[in-house]
Amino acid sequence: MSYTVKSSEKTRKSGAETETKALLYLMNLRKDSDEINYFIVDFFNDLTGMDTYADKLWDVQSKGAKGNSPKALGKELVTLFKNFVCDFEFADYILFVGGVSNTVRINNNLNSFGIENITPSAIQKIKDGLIEEAKNKSYIEDTDITDTNINQFLDKVRVVIDDKKPSDYVRTIIKGHPNLVTEEKVLDAIFNEIRDKQASKKNIKVIEGVVIETKDEALKYFRHLTASDVRLLTLQRIINRNPIAQGVPISFMPILNNCPPEQFNDFIQECQTSLSRALFNKNSSESFWALLENVYNLSLIHISEPTRHSL
């Protein structure tokens, strides 16, 4: 069993934005999002999710256009179909798009749907577009373009329509604590940084024609981000806004109240100095952010629980 990398590509800025939205959709907006640990960029497809043990793959093709016709959708499915007929098994095949024409859906209120919500006439046009595009691709064998394969493939495809702003996708990263960041410009800046980091993975090395024998070998080419990478980047940018300018956090008041009033200012200044030193100490920055990530994750888990102890 093997997999040959074909049709990797460089993406325009608009396409990169859609791919980042797709990444954050995989990471935060699915019932199985917690299973996905790696986000592999432009290797199997535009984006592919992988679990920690490389047992499961979630395949994503993205297209930012808003009014995709049924036939256009069919053509966009070609790389997903390529992976459907390959030796590797994928858990899900996702077409992430900016929008579809009003002739596609039975229920236009559903923005995540399978073939059961596509009109019969649109299904036929999707098949026509897929067959036409598949026949033009050298990486798909004519013998694989059969009615049986296409019907089985379409039964497994999920179409997801992008219905959120970049800032809304970033909010899903800090779910459980929505008031952590309120400024739209901060959220947009975080999204752009995730987008740029994701896009930079395409430039690491040429992989066209690479052959791998197992799914986990894809990680050796370093074209991936992890869920922790994205969460930590987000947390760093939030903390680095200006953690000192806003004064003493309410949650810190019980600790401050144990200090003699005449020492308040000195104590606060000492804490702020220590925080600044930790933030900008390059020798221990990795350990600091790893600790802070764990503290933050525990805070999200226990955010709704009453405080039992005062430190």
Locate each region found by the language model.
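Acidic metal-coordinating catalytic centers involved in nucleic-acid phosphodiester chemistry
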Residues: 1-12, 64-300, 304, 308
